[in-house]
């Protein structure tokens, strides 16, 4: 006969040794259904801290960035504490915050291609195509990329002020204080995967590889993004599980 109390005690012991503490959601799940608690912890290991291609510090910083982008306050603190336990300094934590902010701000470009015709219709102008091409050419040359996101060109057509601000943001927010440049792009990529903005995910992934990133490292980042994104449901259910 299965002893649920022993099962949850084993999970708690292992959680404390790997996470530093027992996540509240796993503890609460264990009260209601031990199998669901075990599944939650298994995912934590397989999709997060059990990954082996990225340093634990980078895994936790990536999880922190994705949690910040998803507004998961309780998870943010857990991943912050883990990052500190794995040796992250505050400048590296700030890099994680910057990567999350950049990805979220860039995601607003997802509507630019759709609203561009409306802007053109009601402004009575069709944009300066030569100037847009010049700006986009400069961005392409500076980035070293073969192609640029379609929505970036649409943003330039909608507003030169906004494209200039976007370039300034990218220069400031994706220039790391302490982490390797490739990890800055990897964190931004993971956030873009989580918020489902394809164009930025492709751009940041390309820049990650251009800065020496490996496919196996990208796989780990995708796993973390999947785990943290799905985990938003569980952390949001905490008050329900307390009943």
Spell out what each predicted region is.
Residues 1-243:
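Hydrophobic alpha-helical segments
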């Amino acid at each position: 006969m299965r002893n649920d109390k022993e099962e949850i005690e084993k999970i708690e012991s292992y959680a404390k040794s790997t996470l530093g503490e027992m996540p509240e959601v796993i503890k609460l799940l264990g009260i209601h259904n031990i199998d669901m608690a075990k599944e939650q912890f298994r995912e934590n290991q397989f999709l997060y801290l059990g990954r082996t291609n990225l340093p634990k510090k980078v895994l936790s910083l990536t999880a922190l960035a994705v949690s910040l982008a998803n507004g998961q306050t309780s998870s943010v603190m857990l991943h912050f504490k883990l990052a500190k336990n794995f040796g992250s300094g505050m400048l590296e934590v700030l890099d994680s915050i910057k990567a999350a902010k950049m990805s979220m701000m860039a995601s607003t470009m997802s509507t630019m291609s759709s609203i561009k015709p409306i802007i053109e219709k009601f402004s009575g102008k069709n944009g300066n195509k030569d100037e847009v091409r010049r700006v986009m050419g400069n961005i392409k040359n500076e980035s070293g990329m073969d192609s640029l996101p379609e929505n970036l060109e649409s943003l330039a057509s909608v507003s030169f002020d906004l494209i200039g601000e976007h370039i300034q943001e990218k220069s400031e927010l994706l220039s790391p204080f302490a982490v390797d440049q490739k990890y800055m792009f990897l964190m931004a990529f993971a956030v873009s995967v989580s918020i489902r903005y394809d164009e930025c995910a492709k751009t940041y992934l390309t820049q990650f590889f251009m800065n020496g990133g490996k496919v196996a490292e990208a796989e780990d980042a995708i796993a973390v993004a999947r785990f943290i994104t799905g985990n938003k449901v569980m952390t949001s259910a905490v008050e329900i599980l307390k009943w």
